[in-house]
Amino acid sequence: DDRKMDTLLTLFGQTEAEAIRQGNVKMQGMVYGNTIISHINRNEYDKIIQKAPGYLDFYILHEQWKLYYQIHMQLITAYNLKGDYKKAAEEAKLMFDRAKARKDKAGMATALYATAITYNVQDRWKEEEDCFRECIRLLWEVSGYDNILTQAYAFLCSSLRAQGQYDKLLQLVPEYEKAIARFEKAAGRTQPEAWGNLYVALMNTYIDTKDYDKAGEYLAKLEGIVNNNISRYELARAKALILQSRGDYRKALAAIDSAAVEVQESEFDLNAVRKIKMEILTRMGRFDEAFTLFDTIIAANDTIKDVEINARFDELRTQYEVEKHIAEKERNLHYFLFTLGICLVLALLLTATFYYNRIIALKNH
């Protein structure tokens, strides 16, 4: 809530002042990074746009490049979510040019990743595909960016699916699997979220190509993942389509009603659900209900046309919920490391730090 955020920002301000007094630029950089992360968690994109440029200058001055790329990425994301694609593209180009001047392949790849996302939110699929392919090529040549590499593959699959390039998508699977294996080896643990992204791509590909038996295999894999963080809407929608293909209309109808519950705030997704439900009702011979639903779809289309950009972001949120989950886990780790650093070098802030630890513990719980 606002009170906790105010407390957190006060703590960051005190820590920044102490870091400056001690000449601890590493801690100062961490403060700025965690400030941006705090605003991300609250969807405060204007705050990110206001603060990030100054922080980026600090990172450049002190050559804290990994933090620079992470925070510049968040600035680009903020512009995208504000709908300012021109500014997002300008920032991505600036980020790429700086990385290229340093011959930093990881930085160049991160900039290409950000550029590809800007193309994605504008439905510029081919340009998105080209960016992600180059991003992936560069990331195979560096280490420490396996999470971004597997996410790039997930986005690339979405781009190929949007273009109907199903053969290319399936050809991508072996190297996608190798990327996940490399990620697991580097992390020392399994990566169910990364596998989940791959299974979603394959499940939806087989649904699109009407191979419902294959789609069912990947749906089962997704449902078998422990701590499954795949969108429940995505799973319910797939289950409804697969059950419909098998003629089990009663269960299909229950599944699609379950999907509708998950997307009440998105008229875009609700209409997609209604279209599937209308087809199921028609196959069941419940024509009056199907026609009523058809009228609802037509009426909703006018609303959707007026809020097309917002609807597009609702779709993105559904597609990339796994990525959000990964990012949240990384943010929690950043908070932990940051708090530990305060305990070690900032004894003057011990009381404030203890309170901050309690906040994070409650959040994690």
Segments (PLM) and residue ranges:
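"A position-specific structural signal for the A-helix of alpha-solenoid helical repeats
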Residues: M27, N34, L67, Q74, ...
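Membrane-proximal low-complexity regions enriched in glycine and acidic/polar residues
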Residues: N197, A201-A299
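Amphipathic alpha-helical segments of tetratricopeptide repeats
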Residues: G13-A17, P53-I60, K93-K100, R133-G144, ...
